[in-house]
Amino acid sequence: MSVMFDPDTAIYPFPPKPTPLSIDEKAYYREKIKRLLKERNAVMVAHYYTDPEIQQLAEETGGCISDSLEMARFGAKHPASTLLVAGVRFMGETAKILSPEKTILMPTLQVECSLDLGCPVEEFNAFCDAHPDRTVVVYANTSAAVKARADWVVTSSIAVELIDHLDSLGEKIIWAPDKHLGRYVQKQTGGDILCWQGACIVHDEFKTQALTRLQEEYPDAAILVHPESPQAIVDMADAVGSTSQLIAAAKALPHQRLIVATDRGIFYKMQQAVPDKELLEAPTAGEGATCRSCAHCPWMAMNGLQAIAEALEQEGSNHEVHVDERLRERALVPLNRMLDFAATLRG
């Protein structure tokens, strides 16, 4: 019998915070990046959780700001020969898997994800080997090696629909790596799901008691929650969904005040969508406690202007994403299944 890797006992040392830039330095790097993007026939693909100034730059240069599913779609279809991925490492790997002919650059290759780190491929392979009768579904927040072992890759925006589909076929599921999202999907679908026990270091920190106090302070506010959050937080939500779904919910809900339980990087695009509404961060620190992530992924914060400029300017392995070709071919199969399934949902 396999022994599951225990993410709760793993230590994820946070990267050092980037050195703040002056106003003049920011202006210098912004202009430099714009010039280099044109010179390299490159386009920026940025996640909602990157810092606002990075998202703004992606907008201004014709790039993409989105969740991981749309990032994958956009990068594969865009004619640029180089993709600058502002996000975390698995997003760069996914871009390379889908677009092997393109040069994939990242501000740094040290941008990790606690869900990815919490699902080592050797332990995960052993876990799957112990349950050969189950269909393996892995979240996009995993390494190329873990994706290569999977039958399906999925993002939070289509997780419920996919598991509902597989359940209708009578399939039993291994779900990895996020235990909270897995529990949410199981509750929504009633599927037979065996969960890996990983968690996002941002969403796992949201605290029920502190959120209750904030709700009491603002009783007219709606609560928006990402399903990577603990079940008790999800149970308090007026809307639950992926990043793009939460932005849509912010627009659809009649409330003028919204408490948002996800990475605060989302506030940039959410505030654009609802400029007249007040957005409040859900608390990540309990009574007498301090937060580690404080509602912002420390690795997402590594996607700074200076690092992006260096990635575009410097050639070499410090910034370019590579995926072994045999591994890429194996990981491409479940990724294409995800994209094909998502296309059927869009009609």
Swiss-Prot record:
Keywords, alphabetical: 4Fe-4S, Cytoplasm, Iron, Iron-sulfur, Metal-binding, Pyridine nucleotide biosynthesis, Transferase
Name of one Pfam family that matches: NadA
Residues annotated for [4Fe-4S] cluster binding in this entry: 113, 200, 297
UniProt keyword Transferase, yes or no: yes
Source species, domain of life: Bacteria
Pathway(s): Cofactor biosynthesis; NAD(+) biosynthesis; quinolinate from iminoaspartate: step 1/1
BP GO annotations: 'de novo' NAD biosynthetic process from L-aspartate
GO molecular function, one term: metal ion binding
Gene3D superfamilies documented for this protein: NadA-like
Major localization listed first in the record, in broad terms: cytoplasm
Co-factor binding details: Binds 1 [4Fe-4S] cluster per subunit.
Residues annotated to bind iminosuccinate: 47, 68, 139-141, 156, 226-228, 243
UniProt keyword rRNA-binding present: no
Top enzyme category: transferase
Catalytic activity: iminosuccinate + dihydroxyacetone phosphate = quinolinate + phosphate + 2 H2O + H(+)
Subcellular location: Cytoplasm
EC number(s) given by UniProt: 2.5.1.72
InterPro entries: NadA, NadA_sf, Quinolinate_synth_A_type1
Cofactor(s) needed for function: [4Fe-4S] cluster
Family affiliation: Belongs to the quinolinate synthase family. Type 1 subfamily.
The protein's name in its UniProt record: Quinolinate synthase
Species of provenance: Shigella flexneri serotype 5b (strain 8401)
